Amino acid sequence: MKCFAQIVVLLLVIAFSHGAVITGVCDRDAQCGSGTCCAASAFSRNIRFCVPLGNNGEECHPASHKVPYNGKRLSSLCPCNTGLTCPKSGEKFQCS
């Protein structure tokens, strides 16, 4: 029951946060549709969701660039969309 309550809270937080799009629960990129990756939850690396690839100006992880990735992603951020890179911009990395 505790796990269920945590998942419900997690989904509510993500649903009401700016720009969050969740397309489904997954384990690996191959389970997600085109233009998405299977990213770890920011709250628990044991929970993963299909999340859209990063667009221009969105935060990214510099080491997360392969799609599909055959393993389990540890980052809560997907790589940037095709044609974009993930350079450092100020204090964080952003797709550009």
Curated annotation (Swiss-Prot):
Pfam families registered for this protein in UniProt: Prokineticin
This protein's UniProt keywords: Disulfide bond, G-protein coupled receptor impairing toxin, Secreted, Signal, Toxin
Leader sequence residues: 1-19
GO molecular function, one term: toxin activity
Cystines in this chain: 26-38, 32-50, 37-78, 60-86, 80-95
GO CC, alphabetical: extracellular region
Locations listed in the record: Secreted
Tissue-by-tissue expression: Expressed by the skin glands.
One annotated GO biological process: endothelial cell proliferation
Keyword Nucleus annotated: no
Family classification: Belongs to the AVIT (prokineticin) family.
Functional summary from the UniProt entry: Potent agonist for both PKR1/PROKR1 and PKR2/PROKR2, and inducer of a potent and long-lasting hyperalgesia. Also potentiates capsaicin-induced TRPV1 current, when tested on DRG neurons. At subnanomolar concentrations, this protein both induces potent chemotaxis of macrophages and stimulates LPS-induced production of the pro-inflammatory cytokines IL-1 and IL-12. In vivo, potently stimulates the contraction of the guinea-pig gastrointestinal (GI) smooth muscle (nanomolar concentration).
Name used for this protein in its record: Prokineticin Bm8-e
Species of provenance: Bombina maxima
